[in-house]
Amino acid sequence: MFATDFVFPYMLSHSVLHGEPIYDRQWQLENIPAITGRGPPGEGIFYPPGTGFSTLPLAALSFSNAQLLWQALLICFVVLGTRALVRMWDQDEKRATWMAIAGLVLLSASIRWGMTHLQAAPLIMGLLCLFVVCIDKNKYLAASAIATYVLIFKFSVALPFVGLLLARGRWRDVAVAVAIAGLAQVAGFARVGGIAAFSDYTQGIAGLEALGSINTPDPWDPMSSPRLDWTYLYTGLIGVPEIGRRLSQVTTVLVAIWLSWSMWQLRDHLDRHATATILLALTCFGILCVYHHHYDLSAALVSLMMLGIMHLGGIINLPTSFLVLTGPLAAMIALLPLATVQGVLLSVGGPRAAGYLNIAFPISVTLALIASCLDLQRLRSDDRPEKPPLSRF
């Protein structure tokens, strides 16, 4: 009935609850089918054990019931997060408005990608909406709790949460969140096998991006599932994964320095426009510098919605260049019927044609990152068309 990606958090929670050696491949082959009724993950489990704490209550249910509840939670967080975000601008907003926007978000391509696989991406998107609202209302305890949860669940998508807290000078909150998340991972490894579990986990991670798998860094590989990171982009352009990784690392360092400097320059001018632009930059940068698949694009919906609401509402006036550069990403997130387009391209042009679609993902994210960087530069120079100042966070 559903895709099998929910197997990963469920089995991690089950193993943490019962003290099972989740990273032992033989144990996976023998026990995962018995517990879930599904086959074992073909390429192992790549989530750290601390993830199991974030979904621990679900392990008390059977796999089928937990899966249904998980899907309901994904939908609820998308709807509640969207509602909270829309109401940031008008507490008296008519119910029909936020309901219509939430409906469009649920129908968007990126949310469908996550829902199809029962991935956590829709949950992260909803949590990011709630996080931004908490920051807007100076509810830093709640914001820090959300950031801590995301760090425990999937630290690779936590940069927008951590970055916004740092931009607001909440260094202590970030330190506490990172410490708690780190302790959760240590406790998780201790619970599922200690040093042996850590060794098995690191061996599995080493093979995460194996050529010929869905996680391959080569977008021209027929087995490839679309990825978003610079390693994927550079490998597609150059053809050598190792060089692609090196170029990705260099690009990551340079962009990180530039973004850090820009955020520091804007630390006393964090109105909603600046915050939304920083959020877009952090979201794009976070998914470009680390391995991610296409469904993780849904987090970019948050900043794009914020900027779109302000632009369409006449609060800010985004330049044409910004709209052009973010247009491809917005179109893919909103409309792209990925499986259908992949099927058409494969039938017409073969794997090579499908490869062009794969490589379009990191290109579109990079263009949106460039757009956000240019907007940050305009904000830094205070050379931007804007209506009366927005309320500060």
Predicted regions, residues:
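Primarily membrane-embedded glycan-assembly and transfer machineries that use lipid-linked glycans
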Residues: M1-A143, L165-L297, L301, P388-F393
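Membrane-embedded alpha-helical segments of transport systems
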Residues: I152-F155, L183-A187, A330-L335
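Aromatic-enriched
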Residues: G308-F393
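Long, hydrophobic, well-ordered secondary-structure blocks that form the structural core
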Residues: V78, Y149-L166
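Hydrophobic alpha-helix-in-membranes signature
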Residues: Y47-P48, L56, A121, K154, ...
